[in-house]
A protein has these predicted regions:
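Core catalytic alpha/beta fold that binds nucleotide/phospho-ligands
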Residues: 1-245
Length: 245
């Protein structure tokens, strides 16, 4: 996989994830209108139902939407470095409940707005490589008191991989170290190389380096309380090789 280091380090593709440890939230606060109205749009508030057949409590619904929006923000931040997180500017079109108790909640999200004025397209001009997707897709798993969400620009999640785990310590430094160790262990196996490391780009997004060379593998990290999660996006040729392995 050494050829990955020759790919341009700033691909249009991205990834975003988030994680919420429900035991570290306060349901009585989450269900106050003055709290959830800063997260849910009017349409999202009106669209809430117990999400049959599993009757998702309202506070869980709020944090599910938060998780989706945070993951969307992380996805878009890599493409639009100046983007500022604003939950009410990210609109969830719909959330489809899972077909079984261990399945995914699936959400469709309108493309996050770009900062500043939007210029009309010039006829015949190509779209910029880093323009936001018209829609993003989220898959969220709610299990063992944690919400884990991953976002992709294709509904099949082709080339996007993710994982999560629990840790013993809720300390921020331990969370941060553990999730990086978890992701690097996965990538070292997938890419068959041991010279990988993580650092942040100028916008604060994590990037993968092989030695000193940035790789075209977008990654996203999340941690909360005693839980950690990651997602990453492989280039098309690498994803195909991974599926064939």
């Amino acid at each position: 996989m050494s050829g990955c280091s020759r790919i341009a380090p700033f691909p249009a593709a991205s990834t975003g994830n988030d994680l919420v440890s429900l035991e570290a939230t306060r349901p009585e606060r989450t269900t106050l209108p003055r709290f959830y109205s800063r997260i849910l749009t009017a349409a999202e508030q009106e669209g809430y139902c117990p999400l049959e057949p599993y009757r998702l409590p309202f506070d869980h619904y709020v944090w599910l939407c938060w998780s989706v929006k945070e993951a969307v923000y992380k996805y878009q931040k890599r493409q639009i470095p100046e983007l500022v997180f604003s939950p009410l500017r990210i609109s969830i079109r719909q959330i489809v409940p899972p077909s079984g108790p261990d399945g995914f909640y699936q959400a469709t999200v309108e493309g996050a707005p770009t900062p500043g004025p939007v210029r009309p397209p010039v006829e015949g001009a190509p779209s910029p490589a880093n323009s936001p997707a018209a829609a993003l897709y989220a898959r969220s798993l709610i299990r063992d008191g944690v919400i884990v969400t991953t976002v992709c620009d294709n509904e099949a999640f082709a080339g996007t991989y993710w994982g999560f785990s629990s840790i013993d310590s809720p300390a921020y430094a331990d969370q941060s170290a553990a999730v990086r160790t978890l992701l690097l262990g996965e990538l070292k196996t997938v890419l068959s190389r041991d010279d990988l490391r993580l650092q942040k780009d100028p916008a604060g997004c994590p990037i993968v380096l092989a030695g000193d060379q940035p790789l075209a593998i977008p990654v996203s990290l999340a941690h909360h309380h005693r839980h950690i999660a990651y997602s990453y996006r492989l280039p098309d040729h690498a994803a195909q090789a991974q599926r064939s392995a």
